[in-house]
């Protein structure tokens, strides 16, 4: 043997280790299925985005409702148009499985991927993970906030928002009766403060093209695939809290 092939290495970093320098350029935070965000974490992510030219890619189960949320499925599913969202110097992956595949398509396009998770388990759906941060998400973002005093730079978010708004404006008002038509018509009409339970694949993917009111939360049994138990989860949640609307 004259040559050893390169091996893809993943650096494991804990809260006690020296943090790597944050790459300069366009940074995307990719949020998979996620529990309700605390106000502290939301604020930390918002400030991080402002300091580092960041944007937050979401689907209906991400539950981040801060300032820089973009419904990235509409950007990721384009065959004849390459969105600015594809051009990322760093993608930071938080949360669990993402069932909106059109959004997942953006992940391999980043130059490098970092993951942050308090369970420390390596998850690498894009096969491009370079660093795994074993810590709470808020500790990760607060570290980089404390280390910087940058002026606001939101050019990447503004470009992604402009792309999304442009593509949304091109959607035909005569969508055939379908799951996508239902999502298009109903998503802005969901009552404030309610909770949506999406069946995986068809419903979740259809609804993730569109935005819902800011106080709406969304969930889906994204680990199921097949018979996902969506109705069971919906009924159980509605019985737990009878003061909230569930759909």
What are these regions (language model features)?
Residues 24-38, 171-175, 200:
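Active-site donor-nucleotide binding/catalytic segment of nucleotide-sugar enzymes
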Residues 31-114, 214-243:
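Glycine-rich, anion-gripping cofactor-binding loops and their flanking helix/strand elements
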Residues 1-24:
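Conformationally flexible catalytic loops at phosphate/diphosphate-handling active centers
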Residues 40, 100-102, 143, 185, ...:
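Phosphate- and divalent-cation-binding pockets in alpha/beta enzyme and binding domains
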Residues 1-9, 115, 119-158:
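Terminal amphipathic helices with adjacent charged low-complexity linkers/tails
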Residues 161-243:
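Active-site diphosphate/adenylate-binding microenvironment
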Residues 26-28, 89-92, 195, 245-247:
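Structural motif
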């Amino acid at each position: 043997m004259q040559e050893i092939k390169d091996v893809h290495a993943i650096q494991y970093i804990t809260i006690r280790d020296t943090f790597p320098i944050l790459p300069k350029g366009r940074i995307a935070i990719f949020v998979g299925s996620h529990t309700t965000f605390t106000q502290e974490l939301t604020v930390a992510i918002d400030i991080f985005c402002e300091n580092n030219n960041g944007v937050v890619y979401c689907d209906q189960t991400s539950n981040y409702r801060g300032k820089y949320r973009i419904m990235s499925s509409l950007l990721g599913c384009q065959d004849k148009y390459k969105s600015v969202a594809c051009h990322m110097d760093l993608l930071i992956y938080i949360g669990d499985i993402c069932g909106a595949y059109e959004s997942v398509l953006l992940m391999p396009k980043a130059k490098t991927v970092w993951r942050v998770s308090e369970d420390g388990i390596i998850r690498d759906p894009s096969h491009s993970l370079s660093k795994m941060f074993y810590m709470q998400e808020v500790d990760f973002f607060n570290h980089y906030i404390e280390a910087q005093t940058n002026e606001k730079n939101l050019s990447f978010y503004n470009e992604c928002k402009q792309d999304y708004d442009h593509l949304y404006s091109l959607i035909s008002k005569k969508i055939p009766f379908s799951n996508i038509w239902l999502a298009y018509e109903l998503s802005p009409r969901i009552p404030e403060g309610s909770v949506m339970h999406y069946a995986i694949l068809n419903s979740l993917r259809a609804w993730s093209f569109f935005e819902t009111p800011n106080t709406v939360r969304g969930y889906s049994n994204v680990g199921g695939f097949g018979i996902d138990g969506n109705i069971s989860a919906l009924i159980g949640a509605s019985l737990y809290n009878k003061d909230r609307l569930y759909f």
